[in-house]
Every structure is written in C-alpha cells, then in structure tokens.
Amino acid sequence: MRPLMLQGHERSITQIKYNREGDLLFSCSKDQKPNVWYSLNGERLGTYDGHQGAVWCLDVDWESRKLITGAGDMTTKIWDVEYGTVIASIPTKSSVRTSNFSFSGNQAAYSTDKAMGQSCELFLIDVRNADSSLSEQEPTLRIPMTESKITSMLWGPLDETIITGHDNGNIAIWDIRKGQKVVDSGTDHSAGINDMQLSKDGTMFVTASKDTTAKLFDSESLMCLKTYKTERPVNSAAISPIMDHVVLGGGQDAMEVTTTSTKAGKFDSRFFHLIYEEEFARLKGHFGPINSLAFHPDGKSYASGGEDGFVRVQTFDSTYFENIFE
C-alpha cells in the first residue's frame, strides 16, 4: 500500500508521536512549528505557533488535552491540543532536549541541555492546574546532571520513577520522591542514546544509539535483554504493540550524508524480530536519515519522520501479519 506523505514542515523532523487512541499524530521539527495530523488520511488539523527556535521534543497527555513541547528558544510550552493556544510557557536557561507527561497527566518532566555555561538539569512540574502562572512557579523537583547530559527520557511505572538515557550511553532510573538515582545500567551502550520507547505494557523499553545498535532493556532492573545490530547510527527505535517486532531507523549524521546513500539502503526502516534479533524486512522512503519512529497504537501501521522534512505513515499489508517467524 502507498504510504501517506505528510508535508507540513520546512526543515528536518525531530520527533513524532501518536496520541493514545492513535487518531492524532503530532510532529515537531527544526522549523519552530509543531503540527498535528489526522493519522487516518494525513490531513493536517493544525499548527502550534509560538516557539522561536527549533522544537526538539513533544509529548501529548493521556486524554489528548495537553501537549508539551521543548525548544531551542529556551522554553517549554504547554498547549491546548484542541485550540492550539499556549496554556503556559516556562523559561529555561538552555535548550530543552526532552519533555514528557506522566501517565496520570498530573506531572510533566523536561530536561535542559549542557550548553551556554549551564549544566544539564532534570525538572519536574505539576501540570494539574496549568495556567500562565506556571512560568513563575518553582519546579517541584530539580536534579542536576553532573556527568553526561540527558538525550532521552521515559516515565517509569506508577509515575514513581523516571528513566533517562544519556549522551555517554548510560541509562539511569531516578526516584522522583527522593530525587536520587536508584539504578544505573553501566556501559551497555558505548555511544550516546538517541531515543528510548516503552513497550505497550511498560515492562520493557528499546533504546536507539549512536553505537549502531538498538537494545531491549527491562524497565525495572535495566538488564539488557536483546541487541539489534546495524552498520550505522540508530536514531530511533519502536516496539510493535501487537507483534514481536522492533523497527529501527537511522543513517549517518546529516553532515556525512552523500547523494548515493539512498541507493545503498542507508535510510530504510529496518524491522527486527523482538526475540530472535534477526532482521526480516526493510522499507524505503526517506531521502535522508530517519530521525523518529512511532507505531500506531493498534499496531497496523507505523510512522517515520526524516531529515528530509517529511512524515510518512505506512500501513502494513495483510502479509505482514501472516508472516510467522520460523
């Protein structure tokens, strides 16, 4: 089946995310304007206009009422999903690299970059009664990162912990009540982590790393369960909600991309079996590295956002579901 090509960004995509029902697909890019799309037919429903810099991250809450974005203009913004208005704008001292709502939607976490003389910090805010006064309020928790900066983040079960992936390949779990690290993965990855995504039940998560591998980890112990090997840096990885499949996307850094790379299959979405660690399919499409991947919550399609500024939504054929691994 032909993929839907969503063209609404002028610069490279930084992150894409479905809401819980899967009817909305959110995308953000370096062109300052996050978009929301109707995932079934690729219609653009709206644009969230307000940032003055590249938008690095976004997340939508459980009820699809609020959207949080973090950008290079040194702000985190919380938006009304339906009306596209800014509920709150929180100033920071450096670029915001990650932002996530907790599962309950009561809290949000975001992290800042190690830049401009500022160290990387992890912040927690209460967003239950979010309004414009949030910009003056102190965060409920603030954890400075003494070692490597945070490049990706997930909420742990029951909103009690936060899992962070770092620029040196380290993964850590933080207890948000005590404000301290409780588990450290050590050196499973030898280079920076670009992306982390949970499985549907939250017991596992997959990482995508610059060390050319993606790995499956246990969410509580941070034990490395599986490794998916490729030949080039992995920018994003996602776990299928219905099949034992993992999809990986990446390519070289944007600086190193040459015109021959598309033919060489360097920008394909690559499908691996979750348990057997074997690659079984590739899908072409992007004219540059894939920066973000997301499975639809029903598992029947997936979306990819690339350095070329396109978001592609690919629906699986029936043969995909009949393919039993032997």
Swiss-Prot record:
Keywords: Cytoplasm, Initiation factor, Protein biosynthesis, Repeat, WD repeat. One of its GO terms (cellular component) is eukaryotic 43S preinitiation complex. InterPro entries: eIF3i (IPR027525), WD40/YVTN_repeat-like_dom_sf (IPR015943), WD40_repeat_CS (IPR019775), WD40_repeat_dom_sf (IPR036322), WD40_rpt (IPR001680). Coiled coil: none annotated. Pfam families: EIF3I. Component of the eukaryotic translation initiation factor 3 (eIF-3) complex, which is involved in protein synthesis of a specialized repertoire of mRNAs and, together with other initiation factors, stimulates binding of mRNA and methionyl-tRNAi to the 40S ribosome. The eIF-3 complex specifically targets and initiates translation of a subset of mRNAs involved in cell proliferation. This is Eukaryotic translation initiation factor 3 subunit I. It comes from Drosophila erecta (Fruit fly).
